[in-house]
Regions:
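Conserved AAA+ ATPase small/helical "lid" subdomain
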Residues: 1-34
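Non-catalytic, well-ordered alpha-helical scaffold segments
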Residues: 11-15, 19, 46, 50, ...
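Conserved C-terminal helix/linker of AAA+ ATPases
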Residues: 28-54
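Charge-enriched interaction surfaces
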Residues: 41-48, 66-69, 73-75
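Charge-biased C-terminal accessory regions appended to nucleic-acid-, cytoskeletal NTPase
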Residues: 76-167
């Protein structure tokens, strides 16, 4: 709903958006036993399915140039617009906190903001170049790697194992 409101989608666009998101990722985001998301990399994939794929679908419908900037690692604006000032964004950022981080001053922890955590999420998916020494990024209980970007793009295109055209 937040994507629809943020991008002022008309009825036709909103209907198309719901249909595409549902087709692309409904089953794995609704308590399916068919997919295992119990480890950190699986939790990362589940987070991508629930929080990033809908943004990609919405951007592709309303603003293809912003979509291209977003997936090429040039603009985190869509992710910020959706989550920065929302309760869902605060919840998401809390889950992305590492053990040594907090939103308020605590002994032995560095202070971070919701915006910083959302930016770190964006960077882990679309900006970080994973090489031999840097092969993954851990944010809280989630793991992202060099496949994360291709993963969200394939799910968004409805060409992944998660797509279900019978819904």
């Amino acid at each position: 709903r937040k994507v629809i409101d943020t991008y002022n989608m008309e009825w036709r666009e909103a209907t198309r958006f719901y249909r595409q998101v549902k087709t692309a990722a409904y089953e794995p985001t609704h308590e399916s036993k068919k997919f295992d998301f119990s480890f950190s990399d699986g939790k990362g994939r589940q987070l991508l399915l629930m929080y990033v794929v809908p943004i990609l679908v919405g951007l592709k419908i309303v603003d293809i140039s912003l979509y291209n900037q977003f997936v090429c690692g040039k603009s985190s604006k869509p992710l910020m617009d959706i989550y920065k000032d929302s309760d869902k964004g605060k919840w998401l950022a809390t889950r992305l906190l590492n053990r040594n981080e907090a939103f308020e001053v605590e002994e032995g922890k560095s202070v971070v903001t919701v915006e910083q955590k959302i930016q770190q999420l964006y960077d882990a998916i679309f900006v970080t170049e994973y090489t031999g020494n840097v092969y993954h990024t851990i944010l809280g209980e989630y793991e992202f790697d060099d496949n994360s970007k291709n993963f969200v793009k394939s799910v968004e295109s409805m060409l992944s194992v998660y797509a279900d055209y019978n819904i």
